[in-house]
Amino acid sequence: MSDAKLQSVLSSLSQVARQLDALPSDTPAPDSSWVKLNTNENPFPLPEIIMQSAIAALERQYLYPEDDNISLREAAANAYSVSMDQVIAGNGSSELLGLVYRAFLTPGDSVAMMSPGFSFNRKLATLQGAQFVEIEFSKDHSLPMEQLLFGPAKDAKFILLANPNNPTGTFVPVADIERLVAKSDRLIVLDEAYVDFAPENGLRLINRYSNLLVLRTFSKSYAAAGVRVGFGFGHPEIIGRLRNIQNVFNMNVIGQAVGISVLAHRAAYADNHRHIRHERRRVTLALSQLGFSVIPSHANFLLARVPTAQDGSWWQSAFARQKILVAVFPDKGLENYIRVSIGTKEQMDAFLRAASRISRILNMSTPPR
């Protein structure tokens, strides 16, 4: 295609598509020699019994997957003690988030989200032509109830809350979330992507409140980011509306098989989760000793304020020169922070060596006062 033809094609892009060019995206690892700590995957392989289910599913790859994910939804209903009509299964929880935006928003509507938050939601709002209302957490990381109920968020079609929050890793007690759900007449979308690393979850609330939708993913705690498995739990009427607009055959046979097997063998991940919690504590202490200010985390990552005048982006580049990827964010107030995923002990040792090396070089180059 000639440049002139390409420009003609690109000029036909919608205004929405052009707006998306300005939104940030994750940095992929150039090759396997890099230490990838920027997207919060679980670093361990699937347990062998679950891997076998994936291999067995490949024998059925010439057939379409089960439509409407009936067997997977039934397995989730049994595992989480809910009814099958309270469950929707998706190609990761990101697909389910997209369904919520499509189902509830039209151009000109607004959605409210706690800030700082998962940047993908800005993209979803833009795709729907919706306004994005960001509500800051209170200084102690609690929910600002007045603002959510009566302030800038009062006209939003729904309120999105991640718990634990990304990118801070902070956790709001479920009792506080219940107070918000009880007092609000709008849909509250509770994204619990990281909840398996937290002290409690809010799933039980869906049987008390019809305006709550809880999202889960197997990408973080269950090491299945590559096969894309997610769930939504809520009132059957809301779940039914979301399933109505879901694509046919939205999950592949491997994702369905792995999802069912994970649900049957969640206990196989106990050591995995213990390791991540242990490394989270160890790295928090080590970073603190290097002068970083680390926000206490209930997720599989840490958000840390860098200890020097250089900002987070500078540190990100310094780590990249040592083949280590960490995340930074454009959000107001996060310019001097980096986020690091919790990986294997070997990965975290490499990260800490790099952090120590960078700090030492900076200290050597700082003139005495």
From Swiss-Prot:
Report which superkingdom the organism of origin falls in: Bacteria
Q: Which residues carry this modification: N6-(pyridoxal phosphate)lysine?
A: 220
Q: What is its EC number?
A: 2.6.1.9
The record lists the membrane-crossing segments as none
> Is Amino-acid biosynthesis found in the keyword set?
yes
Q: What does the record list as GO biological process?
A: L-histidine biosynthetic process
Query: One GO MF term, please?
Result: pyridoxal phosphate binding
Named in its record, the pathway it takes part in is:
Amino-acid biosynthesis; L-histidine biosynthesis; L-histidine from 5-phospho-alpha-D-ribose 1-diphosphate: step 7/9
Q: Which InterPro entries match?
A: Aminotrans_II_pyridoxalP_BS (IPR001917), Aminotransferase_I/II_large (IPR004839), HisP_aminotrans (IPR005861), PyrdxlP-dep_Trfase (IPR015424), PyrdxlP-dep_Trfase_major (IPR015421), PyrdxlP-dep_Trfase_small (IPR015422)
- What name has this protein been given in UniProt? Histidinol-phosphate aminotransferase 3
